[in-house]
Amino acid sequence: MAVQRTFSIIKPDAVAKNVIGEITTRFEKAGLRVVASKLKQLSKAEAEGFYAEHSARGFFGDLVAFMISGPVVVQVLEGENAIALNRELMGATNPKEAAAGTIRADFADSIDANAVHGSDSEAAAAREISYFFAATEVTAR
């Protein structure tokens, strides 16, 4: 398997709980490397643009409101099979269905406040990384 890059957001609920380091440590212990990272307060326009694919869905307004409710950490992770590995580490979207020991099982409160986001495909990863990072901000390790 080739080295991949994936995109991660540590969401406002997890940032508020002060577990940024614990979540990042899980990525690193699993073999992923952080190659870009920013602590950022999303604007409404940024959140709407990032989640535009969900704009027609009933939860869109609540999702945007949640994502601008506090700072987030946006990261680019790199490693073997990074996309699938990150999704495995995150666990199911609904923390009640997430396997024990996953990030969402340990840190998420609900399906809405579910601690983290991760790219679900190579195309999504490329799009999401470029939404928040210029190529010069991503540094191979």
Swiss-Prot record:
Cofactor(s) the record lists: Mg(2+)
Keywords, ordered alphabetically: ATP-binding, Cytoplasm, Kinase, Magnesium, Metal-binding, Nucleotide metabolism, Nucleotide-binding, Phosphoprotein, Transferase
Binding site for ATP: K11, F59, R87, T93, R104, N114
Subcellular localization, as worded in the UniProt entry: Cytoplasm
GO biological process: CTP biosynthetic process; GTP biosynthetic process; UTP biosynthetic process
Subunit structure: Homotetramer.
Classification via NCBIfam families: PRK00668.1
Protein name per the record: Nucleoside diphosphate kinase
Protein encoded by which gene: ndk
